[in-house]
Amino acid sequence: MNRLLIIITFLSSFSALGQDSLSLKKAIEIGLQKNFDIQLTQKNVAINQIMNSWGEAGSLPQININVGQNNSISDQRNNPISFAPYLFQSSDVSGNLALNWTIFNGFGIQANKNKLEQLQIQSENTATLAIENTIHGIILSYYQAKMQKEQLNLIFNLIQLSKEKYDQQVLKSNLGVGVKFELLQYENNLLADSSSFYLQELAFQNSIRNLNLLMGADIEKEWILSSEIKPELNDKDFNTLKNEMLANNTNIKNQFLNISLNQQDISIAKSSFYPNINLNAGTNTSTGKLRTNDANAPIQAASNRNLNYYANFTLNFRLFDGGKVRRAIKALEIQNEMNQTQLEQMQQQLILELSNTFALYQTRKKIFELNKKAFIASKENLEIARFKEKTGLINSFNFRDIEMNYLSSGVNLYQSSFDLLESNATLLKLTGKIIQD
């Protein structure tokens, strides 16, 4: 029995050796740097920043250069109708520099640029949403682990108390004044508490692993959690929270962007009703040489060089396409109406979620206050019971009931503290303030 307590004491007292301290603030900082979801969304933001340019929108010209080199042999010696019946070798080099520029395409270029800007903002909002989810998850995982640790400490306190009572009964038995029944009862209590300790220790270790996963840290990394579970009992106004949510909620912002993107698609489609004006300009140059080794040829070699410039304008106007563009625009307008309906639906759903979370927060505040008083009372009752048990005023069964009430009230207090912190974090997330706070 002593060996069992030594092992448990060692686990409780020395498990902190070699561990780093971790506050909630530090956990969030690590998560913002290493969380995989955040890294992926930031890469997506970088892609959209690259794509958001006037060149991608089609505003800038395209310039191409082409260079070619040709060689040929022409044997006219057996051609009776040739005026130059000789063997000729020719070679030439040609080059072309061409510029293609869409000067006007029915305001489609501006619409494309606006869409690219909105896609960049949308990716940034998606990154913001990933950050909000990560912070929310880390807060809950951190306090979950802290709650498991505090419950582990409660059980360890009970083990020490049970060991104290067990040692007293062993001493009484050795002196011949003890009762075997009482000794077995305290031994059973000590074994039961030790079993609970191991199970609770496993729950604590698993909660640390979950926290490490969210932070992007090594899964088996061990921490000393330095931030306390201290819920802030602030009074909150539902209407204020509602207005903040409708103005700042990231999901609502993204839905507004979806509507705006759809409107840009309509503008792009309508640009087909306008003429397109294009400029094609450039220069062509070529240099060639013709030669023959025939001594009878009047000219042994000749060369030529050409240089041309051109600039052409084209106007393209679509007269009829079978109503394809008009059907596409009509479909986009219907999609825009759907997006508006989805926005209204989302707002109502979020208002409902906010209302439920706010009501739950108010209820959990009351439960926390009650559990806090209950724990204080059970702690005082345990101290009184320790004195009464020593003086024989209560038996081991009565004392065990008081111990279990102390443990239960402690667990309830930490659980209600966690629940209150969870509701507060969810309210911050819904109102778009979790990053600010």
Annotate each language-model stretch with its function.
Residues 19-141, 277, 281, 323-326:
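Short flexible linkers and secondary-structure junctions
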Residues 173-177, 389-393, 430:
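A short glycine-centered flexible hinge/capping loop motif at secondary-structure junctions
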Residues 4-13:
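Sec-dependent N-terminal signal peptides
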